[in-house]
From Swiss-Prot:
GO cellular component: membrane; monolayer-surrounded lipid storage body
Membrane-spanning segments: 68-88, 90-110, 111-131
PANTHER family referenced in this protein's UniProt entry, alphabetically: OLEOSIN (PTHR33203:SF46)
Matching InterPro entries: Oleosin
Name of the protein described by the UniProt record: Oleosin Bn-III
GO terms for biological process, alphabetical: post-embryonic development; reproductive structure development
PROSITE patterns linked: OLEOSINS
Keyword Phosphoprotein included in the entry's annotation: no
Keyword presence, Aminoacyl-tRNA synthetase: no
Function: May have a structural role to stabilize the lipid body during desiccation of the seed by preventing coalescence of the oil. Probably interacts with both lipid and phospholipid moieties of lipid bodies. May also provide recognition signals for specific lipase anchorage in lipolysis during seedling growth.
Region annotation (Disordered) ranges: 169-195
Membrane topology (UniProt): Multi-pass membrane protein
Species annotation: Brassica napus (Rape)
Length: 195
């Protein structure tokens, strides 16, 4: 049985060999194409390297040009500032008794105008809020104002009731004169003091 298996294996392997050989020859042709493509790729890489080198050189030239021009402009600005200070310093020293009070006055005027403008805007905002509240539009925060008004009203009513109660008590509204302390304790307990 092993002999038949070998022969069968040998036969099938022989039958497959020519096909494998065709595949190998195809692979060889592909290898040649790839080697040609590899040469093209090398040429492309060389061209790409040349291109990237020229690009880097262009970037460097641009950077040097821009940096140099900015350096020249900054040095001109520095020279102009030094010349202006040289000319202006004696003038500032001579006119400082006039300029310093003038600058202080101008600063105070500007501050006054800005603050009065701010107060004017605040006043307009407040009057607008009051107008909306008075016309019943319920602006923002009006519910807090209403609750505070209710609390204040209830406290005022409570104080008024206490004043009436103590006023009637001291004037003899309950039929007798009261000295004070005993009746207050009894009132908190819910009983009346009789003497």
């Amino acid at each position: 049985m092993t002999d038949t298996a070998r022969t069968h294996h040998d036969i099938t392997s022989r039958d497959q060999y020519p096909r494998d050989r065709d595949q190998y020859s195809m692979i060889g042709r592909d290898r040649d194409q790839y080697s040609m493509m590899g040469r093209d790729r090398d040429q492309y890489n060389m061209y790409g390297r040349d291109y990237s080198k020229s690009r880097q050189i262009a970037k460097a030239v641009t950077a040097v040009t821009a940096g140099g021009s900015l350096l020249v402009l900054s040095s001109l600005t520095l020279v102009g500032t030094v010349i202006a200070l040289t000319v202006a310093t004696p003038l500032l020293v001579i006119f400082s008794p006039i300029l310093v009070p003038a600058l202080i006055t101008v600063a105070m005027l500007i501050t006054g105008f800005l603050s009065s403008g701010g107060f004017g805007i605040a006043a307009i905002t407040v009057f607008s809020w009051i107008y909306k509240y008075a016309t019943g539009e319920h602006p923002q925060g009006s519910d807090k104002l209403d609750s505070a008004r209710m609390k204040l009203g209830s406290k005022a009513q409570d104080l008024k009731d206490r004043a009436q109660y103590y006023g009637q008590q001291h004037t003899g509204g309950y039929g007798q004169q009261h000295t004070g302390g005993e009746h207050d304790r009894d009132r908190t307990r819910g009983t009346q003091h009789t003497t």
